[in-house]
Amino acid sequence: MWTPQKSRWVNPKASVKPSPQEQLKFAQALYEQSKYNEAIDECRKLIKYYPKAFEASEAQFYMALSFEGEKKLYEAFQAYQKVIDKYPFSKRLDEIIEKELRIAQAFMAGEKRKIGKVELPVENPAIEILRKVVDNSAYGKSASYAQYLLGMTLKEAFRYQEAREEFEKVGTTYPESEWVSQAKFQAADCASKIAPKSDYDQELTKEAKKKFEEFVKSQPQAELKKEAVSKIDALKEKEAEGALKIAEFYEKQKKFEAARIYYQEIIDKCPYCLSATPARDKLKELEKK
């Protein structure tokens, strides 16, 4: 198309409307018609040609909406986050945080990052997105829930130490949150999962048991109490098994007094544990020596 003002041919597809208001309306109309890719292009034009206009933040928001309409969820998250980073005055901040949270939940539910139809072998994007939601929310209504979900996502990725740290933040940062009880339980569960398999190092097992006991004491009405008690019993069994093997080790080394102490500890601390029976038998044998 020939333009007398510029005295040259211009591709109509590359042209921009005379004002940011008109350009935004044009992009919004394309979005409403579900012409998402075209809407994205027009939003980009507005941001490029009118970067300081008030409408630039709305263009960025509609670009994110259009990516979401195209089911490009990670790109949508990135575009939403740009509104927060570049246009902190935007009236859309609370709305954007909720949209980012929803995108994170989609990835938690199994959505994958893709290029075209090809799934990318990358870390679950929910981890990155939830970290941003927590940062963006500060002490907002979604903050503690996002913090809890971050812990759950890390736990599902078998990153138990990181998950445990994030769960603990729910209680320390948002002590009045409805998610504190669940987070305490999950933190204890993560501690039990990272307890070493070695029977000679029981510190993390003891710590996990202590956390479950604290949970039961502080949340006596919690729905998870029954499961927590079951996990305490399992950890007691594990602790007793470890003590039994340590006692047997000392006995083989002919350090009978040390062995006696560990056998007695099993009987005193967990008299109904499976390891208690052999511990009693061993003590009787040691009495004869």
What kind of region is each of these model predictions?
Residues 1-289:
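Acidic, polar-rich low-complexity tracts and alpha-helical solenoid repeat scaffolds
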